[in-house]
Amino acid sequence: MRRRAGGGTPPSGIPLPSALPRPAGSTPPPSGDPSGAVPARLGLLPPPEEPDALEAWYLNRTPFDRGPLAGATWQGEIDRAVLWLDALPYSGRAVELGAGIGFWTVLLASRGDVSAYDAREDRLTRARQRLLAHGLKAHLHPRKLLEGPEGEPAGLVLLPFLLSQLAAEPRAQQVEVAHSWLAKGGRLALIDLAPPNLDPSTLEQATSEMLGGRFTEIVSEPLGRHLILISALAK
């Protein structure tokens, strides 16, 4: 499993169900770390912080994974995630928490009103440039993602590559915050990294544990080697 330069921690995927053992050979969290996450597949590093590196991560232009096959499957799964998000039904405005460089913001803006939030202004600057290049508009806000909602309740809240990078406590807080943004019956959409060797039959249990009791009609789908798509409606 590849690690960040300088001895950083390995990437994390969506947590496995609490009742299941970790896959053989996976890296356990450090002592006292309640993250409940496991390393992501094929050595994919988590989303980088810097805008240029994040662009490369999405486009797979640098060796974030092991070899050309992994790169090809990554891009194919990203393309499928785009089609999935574009087809998700919702009404009202969309909110994106962790918008980054605006990769998904452009798609949401093409469908209607969207407010996109990220903790870093430099990433939102890149998102603004991407929107302008497509002739689209969105409300971009530099803001901590755990802050409470503003404006009218949303019909869709998107969390792209966010929950898998959080330890258990902030992950639960982020799910609670995402729920607070939504109107009753509003849709939560997650696009995130998969853990290695995840049995699809356990994915529903893992997702239900992660989302708690705030959502219904939970649908989760592993795309293959890298990604998981999750949709749920707010109670």
Predicted segments with their positions:
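Class I SAM-dependent methyltransferase core
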Residues: 96
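Class I (Rossmann-like) S-adenosyl-L-methionine-dependent methyltransferase catalytic domain
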Residues: 2-92, 100-134, 142-149, 168-169, ...
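A short glycine-rich, Lys/Arg-flanked "PGG" loop and its adjoining helix->strand segment in the class I
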Residues: 172-184
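Conserved H-loop
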Residues: 137
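A conserved beta-strand element that flanks and buttresses the S-adenosyl-L-methionine
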Residues: 158
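Short catalytic micro-motifs in class I SAM-dependent methyltransferases
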Residues: 161-162
